[in-house]
């Protein structure tokens, strides 16, 4: 178990962009990935979208309760990376779809939907995460996370970052009082992201520690 530190002042990261389309990696099941109305249902996977049109990059939101997506410097962005190297990412592009964690090697064609901007929430001690490509925000929903239109009036989009003595953070939902959890040892190439009791767990079946890491980018070989 990780030991939480008493306070947190975390801001800033480096970033870049990539302009690729999502690839056709398949997942088990074929049911809808749209978040159900019931708050007790777990996220369910489906095959990845293919032939997705290219999206505008280097996006973030500006001021106001329903923030508009505006161009921004890529240095404003970061990734949220688990200890197994999996990155928190949008998977289905439509709003109110579940978020997942994918290793970089299996999500290279996802492009900038794996990058996030951390910015203050309505309550200054909390933060929210804005997707670089879509301008949507991470939102606590049921037993997992979805992405939806950003609104400062949505408490479900505010999160508290709890530092640990390992340099990682635990991400706590303000609205639910539960923490973002993933399965670090998985038989698939993705990890399910859920909300569970905050205990700083680091186990093969569940982990709550995340790193605020540099954004992913398309690398170019230098001859």
UniProtKB/Swiss-Prot annotation:
Changing residue 102 to G: Abolishes toxicity towards intact cells. InterPro entries: CDtoxinA, CDtoxinA/C, Ricin_B-like_lectins. GO terms for molecular function: carbohydrate binding; toxin activity. PROSITE patterns: PROKAR_LIPOPROTEIN, RICIN_B_LECTIN. Keywords: Cell outer membrane, Lectin, Lipoprotein, Membrane, Palmitate, Signal, Toxin, Virulence. It is a lipid-anchor. It comes from the Bacteria. Residues 123-212 form the Ricin B-type lectin domain. A lipid is attached at residue 16 (S-diacylglycerol cysteine). It is found in: Cell outer membrane. A lipid is attached at residue 16 (N-palmitoyl cysteine). Changing residue 98 to G: Abolishes toxicity towards intact cells. Residues 20-48 are annotated as: Disordered. Residues 1-15 form the signal peptide. It holds the Pfam family CDtoxinA. Changing residue 91 to G: Abolishes toxicity towards intact cells. Residues 91-102 are annotated as: Mediates binding to target cells. GO terms for cellular component: cell outer membrane. Heterotrimer of 3 subunits, CdtA, CdtB and CdtC. CDTs are cytotoxins which induce host cell distension, growth arrest in G2/M phase, nucleus swelling, and chromatin fragmentation in HeLa cells. CdtA, along with CdtC, probably forms a heterodimeric subunit required for the delivery of CdtB. This is Cytolethal distending toxin subunit A.
